[in-house]
Amino acid sequence: DAALNAFGFRMGPYQMSDLAGLDIGWKKGATTANPIRDALCELDRRGQKTGAGNYDYDENRRPIPSDVTAKIIADVTGVEAGGAPGQDEIIATCIYPMINEGLKILEEKMAQRASDIDIVWLNGYGWPADKGGPMLYGDMVGAEAVLATMEKLGAEDDQFAPCATLKRLAADGGHFIDVQP
């Protein structure tokens, strides 16, 4: 969350999950693809409504890093607090898939132009205005950087495989904002 807050989002995904409630879609005793959430919910750490979730919360609902959550993360992942990736890697891992998905939306002709995607993110999802939206941000970091991250993520999980348009932009030195269906 700290990395995405520093990027400019008001909330990171764990803060947002706590706000919505970790138990949405969770069933006691069921095993899901999210063992950290399962463990938190089993301990009745269901987010802000219970005063604890990914974070502990004070009386003003301010998030406080949780030792309980840190232990669960360490137990599930084998990574101790402080052993996590750096801010730049976290941002790339969270943001670059949005850029790749934006290109897929354009490939599927679900949007007319890249700037339409940026407008939705800026006005609908709280994208940081100084970053211009995911497609313009893609131009700020460059298609080659986005492609390298997506190839790495795609090697671990096919859903993150780089789309054809991303490969073309990286090869040709093209710009995300110029892509049209």
Which residue ranges define each predicted feature?
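N-terminal glycine-rich phosphate-binding loop for ADP-containing cofactors
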Residues: 1-181
